[in-house]
Swiss-Prot record:
Pfam families: Thioesterase. Belongs to the thioesterase family. InterPro entries: AB_hydrolase_fold, TEII, Thioesterase. GO terms for molecular function: hydrolase activity. Pathway: Siderophore biosynthesis; anguibactin biosynthesis. The keyword Hydrolase applies. It is an enzyme of class 3 (hydrolase). This is Probable anguibactin biosynthesis thioesterase AngT. Its EC number is 3.1.2.-. It comes from Vibrio anguillarum (strain ATCC 68554 / 775). One of its GO terms (biological process) is lipid biosynthetic process. PANTHER family: S-ACYL FATTY ACID SYNTHASE THIOESTERASE, MEDIUM CHAIN, THIOESTERASE. Disruption phenotype: Deletion results in a decrease of anguibactin production and in a moderate attenuation of virulence. The gene is angT. Keywords: Hydrolase, Plasmid, Virulence.
Length: 252
């Protein structure tokens, strides 16, 4: 079964633009349930499901962003939508996966319609909240504080063996994704890219996200939206308008 889960689609699918969501660490399709209610116009929305959760609960977890990117590429190549009609929307850890997938596709001569990098500091900037070495209790406490975990999980340690493996794998992957040197101009990603920051996001601020311009040669804009770190799941209509803005920019 494909790890790409279709969330919503318009009735007309010929030459539809495909928006593929790459979730944050610990995220699954359920986190994007409100995206299913969006009204679309010749558009398809899918979400990438990482190993170790939902119907992939028995799949081995992955602790490498590049491996997750390769998995996404294979899913894109085998789905019914054309890669040149696809915009990948990566949020937090998902932005790292999206960027790596975009870069690998370019190296294969395949060019996406666009890339959106949301809520994620640039690859040469270390995250301010590192959880990989925390004990389970501290790890869960931090997830609740960020807003990426149901508070009830902190009071239900009997569920931890089920949820923690995927959560810890994701955080290991994202925390290991750090580069000590910057790319040169020729190495910058040559596809249209939109940056998005949340005005109340404490995990990745505007200046840290702005630094992606050193990695992407065709940044068309850097939008600031209302919300904390999880604006992508809390305000799907607003995010859809941001995506459409990039889609229009690349079509013009």
């Amino acid at each position: 079964m494909s790890p790409l889960i279709k969330l919503a689609a318009s009735s007309r699918l010929h030459d539809a633009t495909h928006y593929v969501l790459c979730p944050f660490a610990g995220g699954g399709s359920g986190a994007f349930r409100h995206w299913r209610t969006l009204s679309l116009e010749n558009e398809v929305i899918s979400v990438m499901l990482y190993p170790g959760r939902e119907f992939r609960i028995d799949d081995p977890t992955v602790i490498n962003i590049g491996t997750l990117a390769e998995e996404m590429i294979q899913a894109l190549k085998t789905c019914n939508q054309r890669i040149e009609d696809t915009i990948i929307v990566g949020h937090s850890m998902g932005a790292q996966v999206a960027y790596e997938a975009s870069k690998k596709l370019v190296n294969q001569g395949l060019f996406l319609k666009g890339l959106i990098i949301s809520g994620c500091q640039a690859p040469h900037i270390k995250g301010r909240r590192l959880l990989g070495e925390c004990d389970d209790k501290t790890f869960i406490h931090n997830l609740v504080e960020i807003g990426g975990c149901d508070p009830s999980l902190a009071k239900s340690p009997e569920w931890w063996p089920i949820f923690l493996p995927a959560l810890r794998a994701d955080f290991t992957a994202t925390e290991q994704y750090i580069f000590t040197s910057l790319p040169n101009d020729k190495e910058g990603l040559p596809i249209p890219t939109l940056l998005i920051s949340g005005d109340q996001d404490r995990e990745a601020n505007f200046s840290e996200i702005e630094e992606w311009k050193l990695w992407c040669n065709k940044v068309v804009d850097h939008l600031v939206v209302e919300g904390g770190h999880f604006y992508i799941t809390e305000q799907p209509q607003m995010m859809l308008e941001c995506i459409r803005a990039l889609s229009t920019e690349t079509t013009a």
